[in-house]
Amino acid sequence: MSGGFYSSPFWAGYLETQRSRLPVLPEIDDGLSHCVVRFLGYNPGSMQLQGTNTYLVGTGSTRILIDTGEGAPQWAVSVTRYLEDHDISISHVLLTHWHKDHTGGVADLLAHDPSIIVYKHAPDPGQQAIANGQTFKTQGATLRAVLTPGHAVDHMCFLLEEENALFTGDNVLGHGYSVAEDLETYTASLRLMAGLKCSVGYPGHGDAILNLPQTIARYISQRVAREKKIYAILALHACSCSSRNGGSTSSIGSVSESGDSDEEDNNMKTSRPAMQGLSTAEIGGLVYGESVKNSPTFDSAVGPLLNQVLYMLLEQGKCCDHVSILVIFQKPGFFSIPVI
């Protein structure tokens, strides 16, 4: 996970407590299974946990590597030394997604062996595309690509058929929760992953997941619970405003994140129930506590997270002209909740 929204201070704080209790993982772990060796990426951090996991898969002299870390020199040394010590070569590199902490080591790997073929769902120049359902085989391992966007638009998981195990990338982590670029798509991908019924997960960050079905179920439950809480807050506010106004209508404008009426939009008033919508900050206060509203990380992380859920509700049709609640997005971070 790297870049933009994911690198905000909010997420550093979100995972910091968990990170302090993370188990220590070996730099190289060849005891995960008979055909999977894990190499840490030497990039520990609040978002990367113990570091990015990269996996050497197979049992023969030619194997497949999943992900390449962010480009730490120690990682390249660790991998190439292991290959030389065990007389192993890499035929293919499969990249789970475009984030730099998973793709940054490609150049070092190709410098070691230019014959390696690099695969990514949306390939960069010189790389090959990965199609959903595409199979990659090496001695002792058969990997099937599963398109699972949401955390990233090009996110791929890989199902190891011999073990009924899933390389989960950043969709499901070994500790805590992941984050998403597109919440609705991400939730759909989690459900798709659950349907694969894999027993073990090899995540992009953190320790191996020995109870993958339960972990995915927990991820989905957490997403759904937050969605329901935000929707309930909107519904309660709409009912409360309708009751106070006796069901009457009046002209309203948009509501800014500070809760103030927007003068420009007031010039375009329409006949709506006499209520002012909740601002993103007000919803954040009701969901996470009032102190969140004035947090320096609200604009960088909490607000965008809430807007993800609000847009998802709109896209799902849970907030539309045909039900009692309508969320009208007039500009980013501005919305009203009239009763229809």
From Swiss-Prot:
InterPro entries, per database record: LACTB2-like_MBL-fold, Metallo-B-lactamas, RibonucZ/Hydroxyglut_hydro, Sec-metab_biosynth-thioest
Active site: 101
SUPFAM superfamilies assigned: Metallo-hydrolase/oxidoreductase
Protein name as catalogued: Thioesterase pkgB
Regions of compositional bias (Low complexity) in chain numbering: 242-258
GO annotation, biological process: secondary metabolite biosynthetic process
Organism annotation: Emericella nidulans (strain FGSC A4 / ATCC 38163 / CBS 112.46 / NRRL 194 / M139) (Aspergillus nidulans)
Function, in words: Thioesterase; part of the pkg gene cluster that mediates the biosynthesis of dihydrocitreoisocoumarin and 6,8-dihydroxy-3-(2-oxopropyl)-isocoumarin. The non-reducing polyketide synthase pkgA performs the condensation of one acetyl-CoA starter unit with 6 and 5 malonyl-CoA units, respectively. As pkgA lacks a releasing domain, the thioesterase pkgB is necessary to break the thioester bond and release dihydrocitreoisocoumarin and 6,8-dihydroxy-3-(2-oxopropyl)-isocoumarin from pkgA.
Chain residues that bind Zn(2+) 1: 97, 99, 205
Gene from which the chain derives: pkgB
Top EC class of this enzyme: hydrolase
GO terms, molecular function: hydrolase activity; metal ion binding
Region (Disordered) location: 242-271
Co-factor requirement: Zn(2+)
UniProtKB keywords: Hydrolase, Metal-binding, Zinc
EC number: 3.1.2.-
List of residues binding Zn(2+) 2: 101-102
Co-factor remark: Binds 2 Zn(2+) ions per subunit.
